[in-house]
Amino acid sequence: MLEPYDGKLSRTVLRREGGGNTADPADYSPLVNRLKGQVIKISPNSTQFINPMDINANYSEEDNPLSLKADFILSLCELVVGGKEGLLPVEKTVIDRCVHLIYRKYFADPCPENMPILEDLYNALLQQDEKEAHHVATALEIYVKGSLNLFNHRTNVNVNNRIVCYDIKELGKQMKKLGMLIVQDQVWGRVTANRSSGKSTRYYMDEMHLLLKEEQTAAYSVEIWKRFRKWGGVPTGLTQNVKDLLSSREVENIFENSDMIIMLNQAAGDRQILAKQLNISPHQLSYVTHSGEGEGLLFFGNVILPFVDRFPTDLELYRIMTTKLGEVSEGAQK
């Protein structure tokens, strides 16, 4: 979910796994609809599409935005093709070559109908002589011609609304990682466009641990996190799966590039790991041990403060945002 905002503060929110408060981007849909924002439902059965190949003139601060776009497409292909070892050097070479080929028409005449789609990359790979190119094309085939072709379309939704929510709830486990990576790139495009207009952009990334769990996407995601901040973006990562977040090699880079961390109630094992990672004293840990709703620790620079946030339950905003099963049912009836 993103919106222009005059402020600059990146945050990481850590929440305990379990309970009725499910961390899912779909939870934001009622709020976004109420605020007249745009909810984009991304699923195999949806008719709303975003094109992973989208690019704009402001995509990079360098003279050639295609180099940065090629880096994203390599990350996408690594997730699809790479396996544990990632892409082979020859595979990276042919992908990069094809990326430059398929964008020639668009940069010669940058109109929407000239924007390439995933199928253009697939076809360009098939035209290369190297067997590695055909291997990559075969891996991409299911995403182009097969049952997972939801990202083989041009963008047909309004991504320029003040508030945009990308709903990926119905994506399967493997497609969700791919979907999150593509959404991240879409948001980057919005950050660059807002920056050229003198606006900041807030970006809330739920289930962030999924992007840090895979080596193929973790390094790119951390680089994007840093770049967001530099370009006037205000990224906020949220997770209930603290173990997976902390197991990532890149988590230290995320913490180092986060101005503020909000920590709610934590499980015993997670508390000890977080205490070591963030230098939390035993007394401070007590504030995230069996703590109540809206209670925890706030980290801002070198300062650690306990907090209590009691959100009024008689407000319309509360009824829209609550994820408690009984209250959601009552809200729907009203």
Q: Which residues make up each language-model segment?
A:
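Short, low-complexity S/T/E/D/G/P-rich linear segments that nucleate or cap local secondary structure
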Residues: M1-P4, R11
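P-loop NTPase motor domains
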Residues: A26, P30-G37, P44, N51-G233, ...
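Short, acidic/turn-prone active-site loops that include or flank metal/cofactor-
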Residues: P44-T47, Q266-A268
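Short, charged, surface-exposed secondary-structure boundary motifs
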Residues: Q48-D54, D270-A275
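H-loop/switch region of ABC-family ATPase nucleotide-binding domains
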Residues: T239
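C-terminal regions of RecA-like/P-loop NTPase motor modules
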Residues: V242-K334
